[in-house]
């Protein structure tokens, strides 16, 4: 089943000039100005003899091909009446004759409509030109686009009257992590926007938009973290048909299809598949995963061309090729021009481009109705330095031959079926005759419609030798897959081939390359009379044979990453099919779509919501398109406090919600009926455009009522058996690989993981996904591992973060990312700050260099805090389990030879209580232990060579580092000796080899600092590679129990001052709570609810516990739709927060602008003069790689930017979140420092959001929270005292 993730709807407000436009105009509701342009409307039902025009919704630029058009009839009538003006009798006679002649001609046209093979039409605009949606057809437009960093841009082209006034079009931008707010761009487009396209060249994402006239615009934010958009450049390109960005790296082949492994044949009920060529299907279907390469494999084996320039390709209807690029020397945007050779008065109707593996080269496939039913493939080479564009004809594909072959095969198949029916049903001759007549009638209709096809869309299938073509008829459509293959030539055909080509093929290899149709599927509507007569019987007997009038295809979309083809039907349903066979995988019908999967919580009453809406900022004086209306008594206002709609049970909402929804729908339907009764066959919500997520796991659909809905792949339909779980975990791991290589955000993959893990049998899929991803990552060369290690660690942390009960694994992953970040920062800063200090002319040291050193010292404080935290946890572990044997980790036998660093080892812990010792898993990763050793040695050197007296530096000297290194070195030696000895004994190695390995480790640990202090960085010994596998786990635990004999007890002497919870806050290891997936976690079945509560209290995550319990209550069976809940969080923060880059403490309620990571929600202050070592983190977060989002200050956090608006009024619930996060501090600090914050926060809440009654509830809730936190702290101190 295709699951729905979230939906947002933007209602357009009424501007002031709307009321001045006259009484003839109606309310510009989004539902009132859309009409279908997919050639699926019955011509006879929309034929008006009075105007002699066919009011179909086809392209108005296609003129009729009949002998006598309406213009000729009118001219003939006018000429006859003008020639006989002097004679009244003759006038009457001539007029009567003319009327009779015109009526006869009209009757003749009506008869020709039933037999003519090809008919194109034009539209009569006289009846509804005031309400028409001035847009473009679905297949030629892209009104929504999804960027690689999770931004969705969409637009709707509404004009009140296109003949009187052209309006300024708007583009809306929202982030999927924050669906409650969006950005509005007032564009310079006055005509309908035809396409939106995000650049795939990270990190500077650009938005491309072009309209139907003569304008292509590039949009960019003012900086990398703000929401202020501006037009970067405008290109005067006329009659644009297509514009695409070239990828920064050439496209990878799609990963394997997990749905085709089950060999399910779920055909659509409203379609018929006439492709019965089983041989072709069996040859082309991917029945095994071995035929596809994983992204990591293609990275190693394939040659990929990296584009060094930001480049986009634009093609116009008249064949012009514009190649736009950014000139680095000129620092401006430029373009070069090429031309596709076309005959005079010929235009291009459909086109698609595909970049090849060669540099500066691409393929273009075009279709023109003037040329005929054929596709022409061109090869284009360009050189931006010489401004040369070379166009070469490559292939010509005739679609007429394919259709004729299709009809012949269909006739032969039906003849065989009729013969079989006659043999089997000889006793029922009357029924056979009726069936034969119906089949012949349907066959005749199919033949007529097949001949009236025209190509509507072309898609490259990630290959230069495969195409997907959409063809449309009067009331039918078809999709074809074309592949260029080697075809053997029979001996009678050799002479013909030699005659036509001039050369004969090789005798040994009598094969030629030719485009062939490997898969096809036909969608058509039977005759209305037959369908009406047999509707009852078809519905009762077999719904699969019932073809309604809206079963044809409106548009197609191909997801290149996952390799799935999405079909949008004209009846509103969405279908996903296999790209190789066109077999249906899943279908989401219009009646099955949820009304609203998620409604953003609005914790306001009607009056306050109206006030906050009126005070919300707008851009360029435009009306803010918000969910609630700006009018006081508008039926669009939402009055309930909090709403979450279950798609499987729409009646589960409150009465206010249902009544409000009914009022909205009633008003929309009234406006729609008033405005669309002239040209719409029915008032239905149509899908205008779709786009896929960066990794192809989700799609975003834009509907005609300006509603964006996210749908996922039907991953739950794969199954829950162990074999199916292996397939899903491997498939998700390869999607994560694709996101790493293409620098895409992996939010959509986490959504798929969440949806699949709703069943109790599949809640361990996350663990197997991490194992697959880690195993494949370890097979990469070391150079690639160093390049993608940062992203790999962030992905593992993101997976652990959304799983209930895996908070310790998340903390370990975050700490690992911190360690790598600090080690890389100190290494890169070592040479410029210590080895080459800059001096002024008077010989003194530059003050800027000293300041840089002091800022580096602040980073070292984190390393010292972590070292103390690490030793303390090691001592606690040995203290608790020294005399106990209940700690045991039973790893499966199949994973005993797998390195433990690929997964969280204590996932297999079988203790009765919960395992709540973070950082202990580091002892199983020797590579990470050596990195910690290097980090502390470099920190010691910085401390010794930099003298500072800053008050904000906690550790003035390096004695804490010496203390840590003394005992940390002993721990490494003991663990290495045990692992090396056990590995060597199992492999029957000589004792000399064991001693040599241990000698190298001892030399490395004893001489590393000496080489470092002597500035011999190139001579530092590299530690040997030691792998700790699953078979070593029990022996490592036995050594960990004896750490109390290695580590002195004085490491816990200051327990009362520095507790574990305070260390979480200082080290920034708390799991964030305000993300979309944080509110929709995966419930782990390995831990009980009581254990989860204990663990979350230990980590300071009590607020997440409520979400987990709610998720358990709503998601225990794993059946039905997945419910996603979301409540917007405030952007303010309280308490002590450290800058994620500089580690400088940030005071609460600062007035400086700051940035917040959209993925891990950590904060950094925007410095006017950034330090040289922090410049590289201006684009993304150093911990998780997420993008920054800027905020002006905490006092103005209601609106994060002048361009950002809340779709639902944002509930300032930060006081609620920070109550739970503040339990990281002791109760005295908490009570003494947060009273003022609460008072100030309540004051702001009274000012912006809440009334007096809500404040009373808030105060009561705060008192309860304080008591609860005090009890937790007293209980925790009691445990620490007993342990001491």
Swiss-Prot record:
It comes from the Eukaryota. InterPro entries: MED16_bridge, Mediator_Med16, Quinoprotein_ADH-like_sf, WD40/YVTN_repeat-like_dom_sf. WD repeats lie at residues 188-229, 548-587. Its main location: nucleus. Residues 76-104, 651-662, 669-678 have a biased composition (Low complexity). Component of the Mediator complex. Component of the Mediator complex, a coactivator involved in the regulated transcription of nearly all RNA polymerase II-dependent genes. Mediator functions as a bridge to convey information from gene-specific regulatory proteins to the basal RNA polymerase II transcription machinery. Mediator is recruited to promoters by direct interactions with regulatory proteins and serves as a scaffold for the assembly of a functional preinitiation complex with RNA polymerase II and the general transcription factors. Belongs to the Mediator complex subunit 16 family. This is Putative mediator of RNA polymerase II transcription subunit 16. It comes from Dictyostelium discoideum.
């Amino acid at each position: 089943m295709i699951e729905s993730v979230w939906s947002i709807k933007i209602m357009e407000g009424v501007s002031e000039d709307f009321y001045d436009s006259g009484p003839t105009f109606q309310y510009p509701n989004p539902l009132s100005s859309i009409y279908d342009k997919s050639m699926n409307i019955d011509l006879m039902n929309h034929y008006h003899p009075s105007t002699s025009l066919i009011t179909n919704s086809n392209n108005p630029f296609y003129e009729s091909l009949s002998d006598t058009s309406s213009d000729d009839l009118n001219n003939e009538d006018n000429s006859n009446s003008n020639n006989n003006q002097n004679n009244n009798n003759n006038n009457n006679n001539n007029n009567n004759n003319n009327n009779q002649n015109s009526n006869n001609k009209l009757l003749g046209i009506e008869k020709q409509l039933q037999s003519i093979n090809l008919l194109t039409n034009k539209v009569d605009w006289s009846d509804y030109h005031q309400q028409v949606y001035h847009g473009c057809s679905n297949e030629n437009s892209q009104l929504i686009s999804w960027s690689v960093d999770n931004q969705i841009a969409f637009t709707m082209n509404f004009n009140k009257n296109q003949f009187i006034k052209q309006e300024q079009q708007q583009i809306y931008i929202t982030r999927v992590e924050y669906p409650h707010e969006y950005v509005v761009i007032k564009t310079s487009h006055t005509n309908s926007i035809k396409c939106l396209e995000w650049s795939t060249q990270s990190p500077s994402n650009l938005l491309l938009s072009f309209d139907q006239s003569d304008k292509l615009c590039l949009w960019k934010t003012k900086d990398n973290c703000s929401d202020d958009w501006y037009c970067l450049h405008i290109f005067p390109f006329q009659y644009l048909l297509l514009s695409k960005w070239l990828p920064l790296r050439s496209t990878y082949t799609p990963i394997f299809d997990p749905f085709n492994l089950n060999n399910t044949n779920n055909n659509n009920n409203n379609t018929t598949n006439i492709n019965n060529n089983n041989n072709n299907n069996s040859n082309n279907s991917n029945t095994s995963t071995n035929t596809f390469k994983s992204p990591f494999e293609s990275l190693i084996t394939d040659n990929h061309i990296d584009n060094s320039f930001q480049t986009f390709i634009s093609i116009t209807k008249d064949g012009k090729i514009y190649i736009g690029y950014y000139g680095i020397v000129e620092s401006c945007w430029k373009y070069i021009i090429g031309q596709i050779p076309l005959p005079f008065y010929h235009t291009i109707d459909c086109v698609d481009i595909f970049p090849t593996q060669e540099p500066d080269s691409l393929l273009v496939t075009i279709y023109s109705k003037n040329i005929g039913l054929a596709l022409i493939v061109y090869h284009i080479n360009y050189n931006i330095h010489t401004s040369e564009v070379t166009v070469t004809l490559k292939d010509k594909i005739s679609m007429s031959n394919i259709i004729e072959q299709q009809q012949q095969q269909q006739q032969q198949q039906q003849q065989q079926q009729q013969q079989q029916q006659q043999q089997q049903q000889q006793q029922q001759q009357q029924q056979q005759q009726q069936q034969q007549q119906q089949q012949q009638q349907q066959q005749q209709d199919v033949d007529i419609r097949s001949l009236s096809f025209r190509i509507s869309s072309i898609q490259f299938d990630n290959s230069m030798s495969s195409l997907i073509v959409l063809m449309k008829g009067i009331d039918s459509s078809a999709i074809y897959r074309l592949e260029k293959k080697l075809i053997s030539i029979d001996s009678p055909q050799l002479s013909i081939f030699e005659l036509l080509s001039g050369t004969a093929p090789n005798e040994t290899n009598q094969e030629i390359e030719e485009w062939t149709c490997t898969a096809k599927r036909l969608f058509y509507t039977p005759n209305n009379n037959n369908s009406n007569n047999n509707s009852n019987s078809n519905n009762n007997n077999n719904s699969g044979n019932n073809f309604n009038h809206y079963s044809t295809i409106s548009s197609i979309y191909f997801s290149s990453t996952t390799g799935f083809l999405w079909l949008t039907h004209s009846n509103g349903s969405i279908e996903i099919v296999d790209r190789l066979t066109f077999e249906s995988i899943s279908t989401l019908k219009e009646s099955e779509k949820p009304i609203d999967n998620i409604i953003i919580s609005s914790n306001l009453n009607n009056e306050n919501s109206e006030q906050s809406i009126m005070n919300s900022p707008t851009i360029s004086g435009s009306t803010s398109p918000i969910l609630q209306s700006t009018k006081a008594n508008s039926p669009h206002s939402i009055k309930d406090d909090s709403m979450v709609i279950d798609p499987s049970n729409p009646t589960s909402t409150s009465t206010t919600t249902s009544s409000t929804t009914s009022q909205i729908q009633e008003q929309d339907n009234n406006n729609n009926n008033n405005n669309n009764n002239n040209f719409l066959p029915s008032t239905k919500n149509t899908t205008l455009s779709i786009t896929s997520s960066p990794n192809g796991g989700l799609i975003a659909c834009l509907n005609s009522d300006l509603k964006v809905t996210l749908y996922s792949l039907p991953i739950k339909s794969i199954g829950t058996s162990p074999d199916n779980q292996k397939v899903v975990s491997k498939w998700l791991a390869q999607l994560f690989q694709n996101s790493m290589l293409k620098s895409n955000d992996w939010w959509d993959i986490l959504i798929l993981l969440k949806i699949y893990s709703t069943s109790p049998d599949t809640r361990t899929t996350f663990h197997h996904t991490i194992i697959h991803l880690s195993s494949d990552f370890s097979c990469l060369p070391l150079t690639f591992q160093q390049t993608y290690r940062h992203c790999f660690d962030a992905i593992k942390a993101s997976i652990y973060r959304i799983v209930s009960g895996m908070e310790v694994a998340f903390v370990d992953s975050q700490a690992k990312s911190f360690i790598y970040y600090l080690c890389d920062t100190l290494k890169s800063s070592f040479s410029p700050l210590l080895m080459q200090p800059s001096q002024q002319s008077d010989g003194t040291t530059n003050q800027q260099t000293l300041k840089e050193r002091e800022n580096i010292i602040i980073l070292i404080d984190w390393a010292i805090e972590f070292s103390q935290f690490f030793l303390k946890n090691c001592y606690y572990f040995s203290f608790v389990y020294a005399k106990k044997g209940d700690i045991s980790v039973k790893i499966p036998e199949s994973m005993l030879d797998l390195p433990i660093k690929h997964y969280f080892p204590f996932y297999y812990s079988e203790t009765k209580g919960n395992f709540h010792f973070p950082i202990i898993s580091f002892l199983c990763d020797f590579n990470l232990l050596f990195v910690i050793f290097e980090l502390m040695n470099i920190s010691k050197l910085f401390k010794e060579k930099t003298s500072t007296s800053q008050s904000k530096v906690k550790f003035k000297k390096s004695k804490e580092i010496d203390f840590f290194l003394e005992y940390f070195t002993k721990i490494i030696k003991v663990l290495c000796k045990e692992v090396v000895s056990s590995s060597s004994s199992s492999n029957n190695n000589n004792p000399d080899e064991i001693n040599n390995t241990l000698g190298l480790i001892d030399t490395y640990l004893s001489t590393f600092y000496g080489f470092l202090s002597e500035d011999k960085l190139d001579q530092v010994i590299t530690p040997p590679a030691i792998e700790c596998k699953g078979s070593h786990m029990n022996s490592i635990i036995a050594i960990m129990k004896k750490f109390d004999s290695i580590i002195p007890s004085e490491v816990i002497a200051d327990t009362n001052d520095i507790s574990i919870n305070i260390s979480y806050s200082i080290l920034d290891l708390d799991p964030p709570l305000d993300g979309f997936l944080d509110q929709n976690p995966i419930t782990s079945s390995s831990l009980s609810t009581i254990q989860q509560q204990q663990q979350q209290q230990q980590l300071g995550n009590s607020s997440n516990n409520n979400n987990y319990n709610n998720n358990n209550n709503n998601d225990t069976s794993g059946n039905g739709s997945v419910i996603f809940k979301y409540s917007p969080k405030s952007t303010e923060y309280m308490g002590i927060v450290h800058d994620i880059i500089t580690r400088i403490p940030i005071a609460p309620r600062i007035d400086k602008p700051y940035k917040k990571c959209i993925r891990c929600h950590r904060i950094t202050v925007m410095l006017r003069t950034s330090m040289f070592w922090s410049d590289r983190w201006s684009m993304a977060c150093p911990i998780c790689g997420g993008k920054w989002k800027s905020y002006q200050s905490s006092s103005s956090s209601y609106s994060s930017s002048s361009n950002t608006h809340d779709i639902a009024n944002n509930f300032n619930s930060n006081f609620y979140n920070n109550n739970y996060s503040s339990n990281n501090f002791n109760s005295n600090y908490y009570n003494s420092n947060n009273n003022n914050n609460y008072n100030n926060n309540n004051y702001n809440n009274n000012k912006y959001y809440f009334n007096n009654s809500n404040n009373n509830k808030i105060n009561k809730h705060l008192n309860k929270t304080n008591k609860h936190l005090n009890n937790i702290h007293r209980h925790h101190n009691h445990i620490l005292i007993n342990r001491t």
